[in-house]
Amino acid sequence: MTLLTYSRLTGVWFLAVLATVWAIASWLLPVDGDLARVGGYAENDFGWRAPQTTFDKNLFHVTTDLKDYNRYYDVVLLGDSFSCDQESRRFGWQNYFINRTGLSMIVIDTRRYWPQEIMESEAFKKFPPKLFIFESVERYLHERVAYFSKETPPPKKASPTALEPLFATAKPLGVAPHEEAAKTKPGYDPDHVLGHLGAIFQRRTHLNNQVLEVPLAKPGLFSSPNDRDLLVYFDESRKKDLKESDFSDLRSGISVFQKIIESNGITKFVLLIAPDKTSSYAPYLKNPQDATVNLVAEVAKDPSLPVPRTDKILTEAIAAGIPDIYLSNDSHWGSHGHRLFAKAIADFLGAPDKN
């Protein structure tokens, strides 16, 4: 083979690859969901199609730097991706909660800061909030909370003054959300194509098993073209290893966590659990062994714990046939799921509802 022939063949090969990438780019929708992105699943198959209800701007402040927490907020929320990573979509549950209650809120990432760091911060001591919310996805709940069962809470201080009711002066904002259509135009992004193909290769060769495809027994639970399979993170199955003693430690840990937060005599504590897909959609899985334990129900065996039944309000909506309570391409909820999650805590706290 001459150098000229080799150069021509290389050029033809390069053009063929370029044409293939561009052809895929003209078909592949922009990446939207974390499960689709990590697992190498196309938004063309798993992207949501029904409109989602969004706000023009977020009503809460998220920080990844504790230095930003330097003034009074009615609510301090320490949470994970269900609270911190939903800003771009503008339908995070905090928007619905704040819109209904009028309370001010700062959101801090629990993947960066331990609860103890928040409690020991100058702002928390100087400007104690009316409400402290700890939010965790279900599959990481035990490791994030059960260890508190070994702690000894400090004695509760007497409040220096009569505590004002949580919603005494708060006024609903009355912001009107609006519907936003799904993005169904190709992204024409070669970098996305290469990343997508790389993720597919890793999944097919079992180099990356972070996302699992679980078959569903019931279609119509999602508005995506593929509504026959449930995408989930593999580590949802970690709950299958939990025993009754772990559930007991979890309940005890929540109780101690509450006593620690409320020891200042001012702040009320609530723990929010974001249920996993494999527990929320358990009745609709083709293989029952794919379902995982409902930790919200396990925690609720102690009715004294300040834990709203977020599981019930979500599963009731799923049973009613409302699609996209969770998004097919994502581990998080659609706008309706976020709204219901906000309703669960607002109702639990006795927030006025003028709607």
What are the language-model segments listed below?
Residues 1-355:
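Extracellular glycan-modifying ectodomains
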